[in-house]
C-alpha cells in the first residue's frame, strides 16, 4: 500500500506514541534524496538523520529495534526506510532536551503524537523544545498503523503469525498467517492497561471494552513481590518459576477434574490462592510469584478477549502491544487458552511490530497538518 499526498510534509518525519510506560517512535529515513536536495539540506537535518540511523542505543534507555526496520517502502510519494525506537516515558524530558540541542524546532514546529502522554507532556514540548503537538486519537492511530504495516511487506517476511500446536509445548511452533483479508478482526491492545477493539473495515471500528489489568499491572505487582527492576527482569524470573506453587488449581479443590462443568484439574481456580497458607508462603520462590503474576494477568486478558470475540461474533483475535515484546510465554498462554476454551473456534494472532502501530498511525497523520 502506497500513501501519497500532493503536499508532502517537510522532513524529518516522525510519529510518536507516548504511553504510560513507554514512548514509541517511528522515523522515516528518506533514501531517494536528490543531489539538489542534499546540497540544500541543512546541517541540523543531516545531524538528526545520522544520529538516529547510525546508533542502536540512545543514552542508557533508548533502543532502536533494528530487526523491525522496514526497508525501501513508499510513504507520501517518497522512498525510504522506516525505523522503530522506544524508551521509557519517564525519560521523555531528556528526549525533548536532545531535540532542542539539535535545533529540531528550526526544522519542524509541530510533532504528530498520540497516546495519553501527548496531553500530559504537551507543556514540556512547548516550553523545553519549542514544539507543538498535533494530537491524534490513539485508537484511530492503532487501527491505521496496524492496517498499514500489515499491507506493506515486512522485508519479504510475514507480519502476522500464530502458534501451531499451542497445547503441546514440545510441538508448539510459530507459523506465518495470511492477513490479506483482515476483516472482521478483534484487536486486543495490551499496554499498561488493555483496550479491545472490533474492526470491521478501515473506517468502521469501535472500542468494545478494556481492563485496567495489563502490562503495567504485571510489572507493578512483580516489582512489589520480587523486587525486580525492569520488565525484562520480571519476564526472566517468570520463565524460571512455577505458578502452581502460588495458584490454587481445580484439582486442589476437587481432587481432579470438575467434570460436570468441563473444568480440567489443571485449570486455575484461584490465582494466588495457595498464598493464604503459611507453609506455602514459606516455600514459594520469587520466580514462582513472577510466573503466577504473569499467568494471572495473561489469563484475565485471554478470558475478556474470548468473551468479546463471542459477543461480537469474530473468530480472529489479534494481540498487540508492548506487553508482548520478548514475551513468548504470554503469547503461547494466550494461544493455548483461546484455542482450548473456544474448542478450536478462536485463533490467537500476533504481529511482529506489536507495540509500534500507534506511532505509525501518528506518522500517517502528518499530511493532515503539514
UniProtKB/Swiss-Prot annotation:
Keyword match Transferase: yes
**What GO terms describe the biological role, i.e. biological process, of this protein?**
coenzyme A biosynthetic process
Renumbered to this chain, the signal peptide range is none
The principal location of this protein is: cytoplasm
- Where on the tree of life does the source sit, at the highest rank? Eukaryota
List the catalysed reactions: (R)-pantothenate + ATP = (R)-4'-phosphopantothenate + ADP + H(+)
Give the enzyme's main class according to its UniProt record, as a single word.
transferase
| Molecular function, one GO term | acetyl-CoA binding
InterPro entries xrefs = ATPase_NBD (IPR043129), Type_II_PanK (IPR004567)
Gene3D superfamilies assigned: 3.30.420.40, 3.30.420.510
Where, by tissue, is this protein expressed? Highly expressed in the liver.
Q: Where is the active site?
A: 138 (proton acceptor)
Q: Name one GO cellular component term.
A: cytoplasm
- Residues involved in acetyl-CoA binding: 192, 195, 207
Q: How does it assemble?
A: Homodimer.
Spell out the protein name for this chain: Pantothenate kinase 3
